[in-house]
Amino acid sequence: FSALIITHRIGECIMKELTKQIKEKSFHKVYLLTGDEPYLVLQAKHMLKNAMIKEGDTMNYAAFTDGKIDLNTLQELAFTYPFFSEKRLLLLDGTGILKTGKDEFVSIMENMPETTCIIICEPEVDKRSKVYKWIKKNGYVGEFLKKNQTEKVLLRWIAALLGKEKKQI
């Protein structure tokens, strides 16, 4: 399943696909969430995190943010099996790993156990990079773009959010 290429252009389709994966508990080893729609990236990140890790589980969760990442530490965490959990989750949020980590990072992703999942959140990515191509081939790329958010899509999304709260417009 991890070799399945799933790249969507519209946020709604991405959310549907992520919801399906969560229901089926069929996760990829690596997720790349990107685009100029930060709210949808944040929502997707939280959906995946909440599905894989229980709230407050600090043993099986580590976050690297704002350009601060050490590949040795990342590798150590990626190869550590989860403790009383099905998954170990590593979040790389705004680290620039797609620009800096290249070969060593690809090696980590290729060899880490199926019990480890990495979520990468970057506003912009170079689609020509080796890391991007590896993730596109072996993981999941969700691209959330403002230009794809039509009025119809946004209205349905708002209606769905309100429906969860038992409200209508």
Predicted regions and their residues:
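Conserved beta/loop motifs at nucleotide-recognition and modification sites
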Residues: I6, I10-I169
